[in-house]
Amino acid sequence: MKYILQLFVVLLFSFSLQAQQDSLALQQRLKEVVVSSSRIDVNFSENSRSINLISAQELKASGALTVVNALQQIAGIDIRQRGIAGTQADLYIRGGSFDQTLLLIDGIKLDDAQTGHHTLNFLPPIEVIERIEIVKGPAARILGQNAFTGAINIVTKKEFTSGGSVQLRGGSYGQIHGEVNYRTTSEKGNFLAHFSRNSADGYRYNTDFKNNNVFLKGGLYTDTKLPLDVIASFTGRKFGANGFYASPEAKDQYEETEASLFALQTKTQKGNWTFKPKIYWRRGQDHYLYLRANPEVYENWHITHKAGTALDVSLLSKLGTTGIGFDLSRVSIASNNLGDRSRKLATFFLEHRFTFWDQILDLTPGVVVNLYSDFGNFAYPGIDIGLQLSSQWRLYGNLGYTYRIPTYTDLFYSDRTTLGNPDLKPEEALNKELGLRFNSNPLRFYLAYFERQAENLIDYVKATEESLWEATNIRSVTTQGFEMEMNYPFLIGKKEQFLKLGYTYLSDDLSEVAVNFSRYSINSFQHHFTSSYTTQLTNSLQWFTGLKYAKRPTMEGYTVIDTNVQWRFNSFQLTASMNNLLNEVYSETNLVPMPGRNVLVSLQHQF
C-alpha cells in the first residue's frame, strides 16, 4: 500500500511542476477571510491558532455530496461512519472523542446533552455553505463546553443572487436523492431554502435509510444598523443499524433521529464597539430499537432541548481589541432510560488581543468561567501568541486549559452491554501547541506540534470481553502529535488546478491507563494522510481525486480513493462519482464494515 501512496504523491507533484501561475487571477479567488469562530474577528493570516478553511469554491470543486465527505479530506479530522452518506457518523479531532468536539452553525453552538453521537445530525447541506472553519486544538476558552479538542463552525451563505437548482442522484445500493434549492434577494433582504430527500436499500442487511432535510435562512435588512438573520432547519433520519451499537452481532438494530434548530441573530456597531446578540433553540429526538421487528424487546426514547441567549462584544482601542461575552442556556432531556433531567448553565468569556512593534507580535490572553447548576463552577485560562516573521511567515503558539462535563449518557445510561456512572468527574486537559504558517497567495502551508495532558478522561472500558462496558474516568493520558497541511492552487496553461496535502501523527501515552478494553479513547489515528487533486481538463470538464490513508494502533492501515468527474453544459451539470476505487476492505468504528467500490451519478439544473 505504501507504493500506491508514493506513486500518488509523485503524480500530484509532477502536475504542480508544470504549473504556470497567474497570481492576479488566483488572488481574486483567495481573498482574505475574517475568521468568525472566535470572540474577536481576526484575519485568517493573522490568527495564532491552527485553523483550516474550506471555501464554497473548494466544496464545489471537490464534488463532495455531504459535509462528512468534505471533512474526511482534512488531516487530523477523524470521521467514523457507520454506513454510507453520513447517515450515522461521529466526529473526532486530534485524537479526542466525539463528545470532545463542538459543532457550530453561524456561531450557534449545537452541543447535545444526551450524547455527541448526534452532533453531525445538524450538518447543513453543501449548497447553503459559504465556508467551513475548522479550529484544531483546545477551543473551550473561546467557545465553551465540548470544544475540548477542537470545533467546527459552518458559515452559511449570506450574500447571493436570485435563482435556484434542482438535482437528482442515483447509484449503488439503490441510492436515490432529490433536492430543490431556491434563492431570492431584494433591497430589503434575502431568503434561501433547501429541501432534500435521500434514501437507499443499504449496502448489506439492515443498512437501508431514509433521510429528509430542510434548511431555511432569511435576512431582513430594512434597518441597515440592525440587520436580522434567521435560521430554521430540520433533519430527520430513519435507518437500519446493523452492528452500529451494542455489538457487531446485533444485526437487527434500528434508529430514528430528528434534529431541529431555530436561531435569530444580528450584528451592530457603535463607534469602536461591536455587538453580536443571538437567541437560539435546538431540539434532538432519538428512538432506538434493539430488534427492528420487535420493539417490545428493548427500545430507548430520548428528547433533548436547549434554549439560550448569547452576546459577543468587542472593543477596539489603543490597547488592542477586547472581546467579552456570555452565553446563558437551559438544557433538558426526557428519556425512558436516562430519566427526566435538566440543568442551567452560564458561560462568561473574556480575552484581549495586544499587538506590539507594528503588529509583528501579538498576545491574546483570555479566560472562560462556567457556572453549572449540577456540576459547580470552573475557570479555565489560556493564551495565544503570534510572531510575524515576514509578510509570508508566521510563528504561533498557544497554551491553555480545556474541559468537558459528562453527558447524560455518560452518567445514567444502562442496557445489556453498557453502564453509565453518576459519579463521573469533568474531563480536564492542559494543551500546548507550536506552529509555523506560510501564507503567500496562492500557496498556503502550515505545520504544528501539539501536546495534550488530559486528566479524568471519560471512556467506556471493561476488564474482559464478557464484562459490561462501564463509563469510567481513566487516568491521565498524554497525547502528542505533529500535523502539516499544504494548499496549492495553480494553473496548467489556462486551466485551474488545486492540490491539497495533509498529514497528522498522533501518539497516546497510555502507561497510566490500566484497562484491557477501551471503546473510544485508545483507538485514535496514529497516521493519517490525506491528498486531493482537482484538475480542470477543459472549460466544462473537471476531475477530482481524493486519497485517505489511515492507521490506528490496534488495526491494519487502509487506503481509500474516491474520484469524480463533473461536466457542465449550459445550465446543467452532470457528475459521476466512484467511491472506494480500490475496493478496500475496512471499518471506521465498532467493526462495522464500510461499503466496497460504489458509484453515484447526479444531474443538476440551475435556474
Where are the predicted features?
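Flexible loop and strand-edge segments within Gram-negative outer membrane beta-barrel domains
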Residues: 200-207, 211, 221, 225-306
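N-terminal periplasmic "start-of-domain" segments of outer-membrane beta-barrel proteins
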Residues: 29-60, 90
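Short strand-turn segments of transmembrane beta-barrel domains in outer membranes
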Residues: 151, 156-184, 194-195, 200-207
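Short acidic/polar hinge/loop motifs at secondary-structure boundaries
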Residues: 108-136, 155-157
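Extracytoplasmic beta-strand/coil segments of soluble accessory domains associated
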Residues: 68, 72-108
